[in-house]
Structures are given as structure tokens and as C-alpha cells.
Amino acid sequence: MLFLLSPAKSLDYDTPLPPGLAHTLPPFIHESTQLIEVLREKSPQELASLMGISDALAGLNAARYAAWSPRFTAANARQALFAFNGDVYEGLDARSLDGDGLRWAQDHVAILSGLYGVLRPLDRMQPYRLEMGTRLATGAGANLYRFWGKRIAEHLNQRLAADATPVVVNLASQEYFKSVDTAALKARVIECVFEDWKGGRYKIISFHAKRARGLMARYAIQHRVVAPRQLEGFDLEGYAFDASASAQDRLVFRRKDAG
């Protein structure tokens, strides 16, 4: 079973890492290098327009692309699970996981990425900004979905090859999950939906839903979840499985009071 996460825009390369933290390298360094070469051709102004970001952010990322190297070291990179710093990753709270938990996560969590394709939790990554929905034209086509093609699905298939009944639990946004060619994916896909009570009904509230995706990943790591039925036990921060609102491959978790 694999749990898919989106990356985060916010990054943390300052907080000291846990001592003795293991590291691995991303599987698609060659492809990332190709994308960096395309990005380096663009001015900060072009990046601002392409990505819909401020001039200051465009300048920062132009500098990141210029500094990017196909050699990943402790000086220029850090493990993905500790580099991303957003709502999802606050819910996951990697720093509180023990070594066994991190090793389990390494085998069962996959972070989708516009620049890196897929990252394992302990894969080193250099800082970047490149959302999967960016219309960055390459030799493969008009956007990153065309660039990545079937690569991400095939990578996930390889990671699931030893499973008798391969399952992907999608905790990523639709923007990122769209990068997985489901026609090429040889696995059942289960979507987890998190709803909060507001205005007299249950609805998806972005901030809470993002955090809940991280909480679900944390729950899976802590409980070593390897079967879909185990997901129904998720109960962190007041959420509970609602069978009446769920379908076989769409599990709905609801919370009455966010507190």
C-alpha cells in the first residue's frame, strides 16, 4: 500500500535535522535536470507570469534554479519529509516519528512533485517552486503532465510490485494526482475525503482537509496500515469514518467540531 501526498509551497531548510537521519536520492534526477535547464532559460519576469507569483518569489526561484545541482549533498539539500512545511506536513509531524516509523514511511509514502516527479520521505531535495499544474512547455508537450507522462505511474507500480493486492491511497490534491496516469497504474485507488461541519452541513474546508491528509498519513505510519479496512479506524483530532457517506473507494471522514 502506498500513500500519496502533495508537496508544500512552504519550505524549511533552517530547522536542524534529527541526528543520524538517513537519506536517499530522488529516482528522477535526470528528468529534474532537464526541467531545470528549461527553467534556467526564463527570466524572473517570465517566471512570475508563468507561475502567477510575485517578483520577489520569482527572483528567489530563479536563484534556486541557477544554484541547483545534480549532486545532492547535506549542504544543498535535505530530506523531503523534513523540507516541506505546510498544513499537510504539520499534520504528519515527521519530527515526532521514531526511526522505525520513518523507515516504514520510506516504503509506504510517496510525495508527488512538479520538479522531482516522486519523492520518498528520505529522498534529498534541493529547494524549488514548480507546481504540477504549471504550463511549462518542454520537448514532451505543453505542460508538466505531458512531461511526466507514464513515468510516475510506472514508478508507483514498481514500488507496489511485491504487494499481492496493490492499493494506492490518494491523499494528494487533484492537481497532483492528475500526474498519475491511472490507465497505466496497476493498483486500486482509494480516495480519502475529510469534511467538517459548517453552516449547517458537512463540507470540505481546505485548511482542515490539508491538515487531515497529513494526519491520515501519520495514522498510517503509526499503525502500519497495509489494508483498506484499517483506514476506517482513523480518529485523529476528532475525525471519524462515516460509512453512510462513503463508497468502496471513497472513504469519508467527518468532524462535527474542529475545536
Curated annotation (Swiss-Prot):
GO cellular component: cytosol
Classification via HAMAP family: UPF0246
Membership in a protein family: Belongs to the UPF0246 family.
Listed name of the protein: UPF0246 protein Aave_1172
Domain of life: Bacteria
Annotated organism of origin: Paracidovorax citrulli (strain AAC00-1) (Acidovorax citrulli)
NCBIfam families the record matches: PRK02101.1-3
A Gene Ontology biological process term: response to hydroperoxide
